[in-house]
Curated annotation (Swiss-Prot):
Name by which UniProt lists this protein: Large ribosomal subunit protein uL6
Family affiliation: Belongs to the universal ribosomal protein uL6 family.
Gene Ontology molecular function, alphabetical: rRNA binding; structural constituent of ribosome
Gene Ontology biological process terms in this record: cytoplasmic translation
S-S bonds: none
Name of the gene this protein is made from: rplF
Length: 177
């Protein structure tokens, strides 16, 4: 039985929740998010809280209810506060610049890398070696950050590459003669 699913999600003032079958729409000051939940999950909205439980006849009902609760909690946080993800570029000549909804990266390749941002995601570069991603959808921000990191992952000898701001890169010792 899922302990996560037993905790209700508190819906703050100014957030509108619409339940249409298994399709949940949450609208707040930062935007609107929609998600289709698994058929094994039953969602109830009462007194500014969302409660979750399994439907009869589904073996994985509690597990799916816990997943649905975590997803909807992230949606509520996203439309009220939003999410940010910070990336750092470590290496000589590694630079980033934002032009509109395109991030231009110089990562030591013979060509610049241009990454198109999806709708709803904004980026800014406080310095040439930092990227800050902002948006309402936690999953999309994480995917964009992972895509940017995949262009040049931190290598284990000097730690050069694109890394998350809170990431600790374990370095190896160089070969000795």
């Amino acid at each position: 039985m899922s302990r996560v699913a037993k905790a209700p999600v508190v819906v703050p003032a100014g957030v509108d929740v619409k339940i249409n079958g298994q399709v949940i729409t949450i609208k707040g000051k930062n935007g609107e998010l929609t998600r289709t939940l698994n058929d094994a999950v039953e969602v109830k909205h009462a007194d500014n809280t969302l409660t979750f439980g399994p439907r009869d006849g589904y073996a994985d009902g509690w597990a799916q209810a816990g997943t649905a609760r975590a997803l909807l909690n992230s949606m509520v946080i996203g439309v009220t506060e939003g999410f940010t993800k910070k990336l750092q570029l470590v290496g000589v000549g590694y630079r980033a610049a934002v032009k509109g909804n395109v991030i231009n990266l110089s990562l030591g390749f013979s060509h610049p890398v241009d990454h198109q941002l999806p709708a709803g995601i904004t980026a800014e570069c406080p310095t040439q070696t930092e990227i800050v991603l902002k948006g309402v959808d936690k999953q999309v921000i994480g995917q964009v950050a992972a895509d940017l990191r995949a262009y040049r992952r931190p290598e284990p000898y000097k730690g050069k590459g694109v890394r998350y701001a809170d990431e600790v890169v374990r370095t190896k010792e160089a070969k000795k003669k």
